[in-house]
Amino acid sequence: DYPRPQLARPSLDHPTWMSLNGLWQYAATEGQATPTFGKSLNDQVLVPYPIESVLSGVQKHSDFMVYRRLVDVPASFTAQGKHVRLNFGAVAQDATVYVNGKEVAKHIGGYTSFSADITQALRPKGSQEIIVAVHAPVDGVNVMVGKQRLKPDGIFYTAASGIWQSVWLEPVPAASFAQLEFTPASSLDAFTVTSKLQGSSGNATLHVTAYADGKPVGEVSGAAGAPLRLAIKQPHLWSPQDPFLYTFKATLAQGEQRDEVTSYAGLRTIGIAKVGGLNRVVLNGKPTFLLGTLDQGYWPDGIYTAPTDEALKFDIQKTKDLGFNTIRKHIKVEPARWYYWADRIGLMVWQDMPSLPNGHNEKLSDADKAGFRKDVTAIVEQLKGETAIIGWIPFNEGWGQWSIPAAAELADQIKKLDPSRLVNARSGANCCDTKGDPKAGDLIDVHDYQGPGLPAPDATRASMDGEHGGLTLGVADHIWPNTAINPYGSVKDNAALNDGYVANTAVLRDKGPGIGVSGSVYTQITDVEGEHNGLYTYDRKVEKVDEGRVRAINEETIRAGGPR
């Protein structure tokens, strides 16, 4: 399946793209140097799985590595003046890309996508050599690493280095789409269409048609790159109960050349409003309790990369089946297809920023802080077209938060980039490396194990429980080997886990509405390595809870926190 359904150049009739996932030549190297060209490498790696994973075939970390692949580019990709674009979903941490010995791209940041026009580097015929040189530091560096560690322990897990998302080629016109965003109007009857372009795009025009169930419901034309208002007839709103998505067909025209893509988006708003005198989160103008699970995006065989698209979808679907309406995507950014499934299945998403290493707050240089700010901007810009994402979380428990004002600064930075969503300036205001309240952002957020936390809103912010629960139950024969178990909140058996979950969530149902709590996040949807506090085992083979009981209490809690 096409790796980026939010900007799909291929149609069912014209699948004009070429996957480069599969076996690549591979070599770990001693340091960062220009690779040798035209020479085979001794080992192999299965892309797009990080080198530490079983599926990669390597199962060993290296700070430096080189990937090599020979590719026959179809003649149709360069016919009629087309250009060839090479796309990478993500490479951890820094990547330099060469085609036939010519450097075509350099990218810093392990959680964001990048691409390169490689047309001028292609040979007239025969195989094309693609080489990717990667620097993947994990420990001892102040960059976004999330929970990756070279020595996993407790709440920190195996590293995920190298190419860990899809790689593909596609033919494009000289002027082409790089990104399309559809931002719902506050009036909920239109989208603002924003296009980002690549190549020579002077005097290019954009035409977009919106479809609902295959029928056109709006269209707009104008200058490419400028924001355009696309009015929608008889608006159909997106919500977890009804995750309706509009389909869009967009054409970028410049002279005789056309770039045609399909996209999609849901029509919804998210914000804070006074409800009964208290600040509450409102979805489409209505108070909504955001009942979520913590989702860390780890798999035993692929680490950061799901083994299949079905596996990627599984956690989202099961979260929905259990009666939750929200996911907190914890300290990780997922491939575009993950958000596609969240959009379609209907779950709201709190999107964390992958953290800098914890415990290093006093050691961060000005360059470290600037690098984090730059990465935050890149992640927001990449993901702000995703319907499911309703809010951003720049800091978790103070990890990498170098000062109290830093949370306010990042919250303001994100709000300027994306005023259409909520910003939770720091999750876990009462915990760990957090030093104090910056009095910024849209929410007050506390962590309380086992909890739940019941913080009250204040004069400017709504409130939520950002993490609670963590009831721990290991299941024999489904436990990650050779990792110390993090045993907080242990229960003796499945019955105790079920009873504990129901009792815990009932507190939110019974006390949350009166206090004005707008949401909660239960830790967590699956076990992860040494953490056995999932509702599913790490291998996803055992559901530890009674789905019917969990769904019933969850639905009651969402109703209690909704419109009166």
Regions found by a protein language model. Give the residues of each.
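Beta-strand-rich binding/interaction modules
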Residues: 99, 190-222, 228, 248
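Substrate-binding/catalytic cleft of secreted carbohydrate-active enzymes
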Residues: 326-554
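Conserved, mostly hydrophobic/aromatic
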Residues: 24, 101, 167, 246, ...
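N-terminal carbohydrate-binding accessory modules
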Residues: 180-182, 249-319, 556, 563
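Short hydrophobic beta-strand segments in globular cytosolic domains
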Residues: 104-105, 217, 288
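Accessory carbohydrate-binding/adhesion or oligomerization-edge regions at the termini
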Residues: 1-58, 133, 137-142, 163, ...
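Accessory beta-strand-rich segments of carbohydrate-active enzymes
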Residues: 10-11, 25-31, 57, 62-176, ...
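Surface beta-strand/loop "capping" patches
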Residues: 171-201, 280, 557-564
